[in-house]
Amino acid sequence: MEYEIVIGLEVHAELATKTKMYCGCTAEFGGQPNTHVCPVCMGLPGALPHINKRAVDYGIKAGLALNCSITHIGRMDRKHIFYPDNSRNYQITQDELPLCTNGYIEIELEDGSKKKIGVERIHIEEDAGKLLHTNAGTLVDFNRCGVPLAEIVSKPDMRSPREAVTYLEELKSILSCVGVSDCKMEEGSLRCDANISVMKKGAKEFGVRTEIKNMNSFKAVEKALNYEYERHIKAIESGEKLTQETRRWDDAKNETAPMRSKEEANDYRYFPEGDLVTLNIDDEWIESIRKTIPELPYQKRERFIKEFGIPKYDASVLTLTMSMADFFEKTAKISGDAKSASNWLMGDISKIMKENYVWIEDLKFTPEQLSELIKLINEGTVSNAIGKKVIIKMFETGKSPKNIIEEEGLIQNSNEDEILNIVKEVLSENEKSIEDYKNGKNRVVGFLIGLVMKKTKGKANPKIVNKLMIDELNKQ
């Protein structure tokens, strides 16, 4: 029996406003617990909310970037939820009149074909606080309570976990590009819940739906969806009755666990928020925001491929965040070597950022300095191997590559006589490798070149080493 997976995603993106959704408290991440609070976001009796216009602007901007229709009449509603991280026992959100509807994101599938994933709606709302569970009990931090969110609800159009991750990557890239959210998953500013069901291939009715929460990375989303797909199939084939429920992904155990039965809309007892006015959004407002939308990621990808001649894969990776795309574009233009700029950013620099938990905007060096390093390598002043050491020093100190090379004595040695002596020395110490070469084992050339580079501490010009090594081997 063949089965088909049906996936829909609910993405919560914290909007990049300076203040909270319904009060003037800072929306900045972090801070000492319960210091970014006031009577409004704490839900104290008599405290009245007022809506953050910038949050509405950002919601509209997200909708336009995702090809949505923007409502002209929007309304805020109360959604009743009884959790300790929401002190007023209701969330101010949108129910019947969301800000944006009927959009789509176009993604590229693994076979190169394009597919449109529908965006059912985008509504704006407030975030909840955080619960910290300890051995002594549960602590509540209300700093995040009231931070503006855009909830982006997809249609159930995805048919594989890989499609879901591709959709998320493109969504993150778009939101980052238009500047409505920084999309930092490790800070909780981009969170995703998944709804999954499994049905027999060709069936017209979806199966029993499961919601999955607590997925803190795109990798976790893919793993959780694959796990649930297998769990549903096993249940169907064994005759087990599935129930609509919410489950939590456990990253340590690589499995989901039950949280609670899945609520329906009527469980939340929605009704209009009487303390806030209706949103009246005219065409002039919408068009003024449309004019601020920059070049979108798919447009930037196409331009990078055409203008800089880089592969499609490179363009896709470099445009995942706009800060990375901007850094690349500046470096490519200044250095005149787009492929080297791409290789450095996707390779060593991304590795350094990952190991040190920093973003590209946190780097101490600039596109101008990276361009200088690329030029020094291309001119033969230093080898690519030395360049890898220089980039680490640039990250640590912010110094220019030229200064680092001079201070560390890293200038490349291109003196053929000196290099030839070292080549002969290496060959005299590795007679077996010479015999292997004579017997057609050409791989030993790389091994021998590596020994020369080791003796010169990476300073020998690799092109000269390669030429001299082959010449000497052929003389043996």
Swiss-Prot record:
Disulfide bond entries: none
Keywords from the UniProt entry: ATP-binding, Ligase, Nucleotide-binding, Protein biosynthesis
Reaction catalyzed: L-glutamyl-tRNA(Gln) + L-glutamine + ATP + H2O = L-glutaminyl-tRNA(Gln) + L-glutamate + ADP + phosphate + H(+); L-aspartyl-tRNA(Asn) + L-glutamine + ATP + H2O = L-asparaginyl-tRNA(Asn) + L-glutamate + ADP + phosphate + 2 H(+)
Keyword tRNA-binding: no
Pfam families membership: GatB_N (PF02934), GatB_Yqey (PF02637)
Keyword Ligase: yes
GO molecular function terms listed in the Swiss-Prot or TrEMBL record: asparaginyl-tRNA synthase (glutamine-hydrolyzing) activity; ATP binding; glutaminyl-tRNA synthase (glutamine-hydrolyzing) activity
Example GO biological process: glutaminyl-tRNAGln biosynthesis via transamidation
EC number: 6.3.5.-
Top-rank EC class of the record's enzyme: ligase
Classification via PROSITE patterns: GATB (PS01234)
Record function comment: Allows the formation of correctly charged Asn-tRNA(Asn) or Gln-tRNA(Gln) through the transamidation of misacylated Asp-tRNA(Asn) or Glu-tRNA(Gln) in organisms which lack either or both of asparaginyl-tRNA or glutaminyl-tRNA synthetases. The reaction takes place in the presence of glutamine and ATP through an activated phospho-Asp-tRNA(Asn) or phospho-Glu-tRNA(Gln).
NCBIfam families: gatB, PRK05477.1-2, PRK05477.1-4
Subunit structure, interactors included: Heterotrimer of A, B and C subunits.
Assigned protein family: Belongs to the GatB/GatE family. GatB subfamily.
Listed name of the protein: Aspartyl/glutamyl-tRNA(Asn/Gln) amidotransferase subunit B 1
